[in-house]
Curated annotation (Swiss-Prot):
GO biological process terms held by the UniProt record: protein histidyl modification to diphthamide; tRNA wobble base 5-methoxycarbonylmethyl-2-thiouridinylation
Annotated family: Belongs to the DPH3 family.
Secretion signal span: none
Cofactor(s) recorded in Swiss-Prot or TrEMBL: Fe(2+)
Name of the molecule in the record: Diphthamide biosynthesis protein 3
Recorded domain comment: The DPH-type metal-binding (MB) domain can also bind zinc. However, iron is the physiological binding partner as zinc binding impairs the protein electron donor function.
Pathway the protein acts in: Protein modification; peptidyl-diphthamide biosynthesis
CC per GO annotation: cytosol; nucleus
């Protein structure tokens, strides 16, 4: 599978209402991926208007702050308890 680019999670925009990360696509639309898909290990964001895809670079524990921002609990624990 060929990806258009690799993008750090910090460079994406997170919408707590839709729980989607987005990033501008060259076609004018936006790549998108849901936080729950990322929690399940998915790292490919797709553009709904064209065939381009990007790889999102992140660590699983990075997602906790975005779940907190959305006011929801992750479907699985993101940080090992001590």
């Amino acid at each position: 599978m060929s990806v258009y680019d690799e993008v750090e999670i910090e460079d994406m925009t997170f919408d707590p209402d839709t729980q989607l990360f987005t990033y501008p696509c060259p076609c004018g639309d936006r790549f998108q991926i849901s936080i729950d898909d990322m929690c399940d290990g998915e790292d490919i964001a797709v553009c709904p208007s064209c065939s381009l895809m990007i790889k999102v670079v992140y660590e699983l524990h990075d997602l906790q702050e975005y779940y907190d921002e959305a006011g929801v609990e992750p479907p699985v624990p993101l940080v090992a308890s001590a």
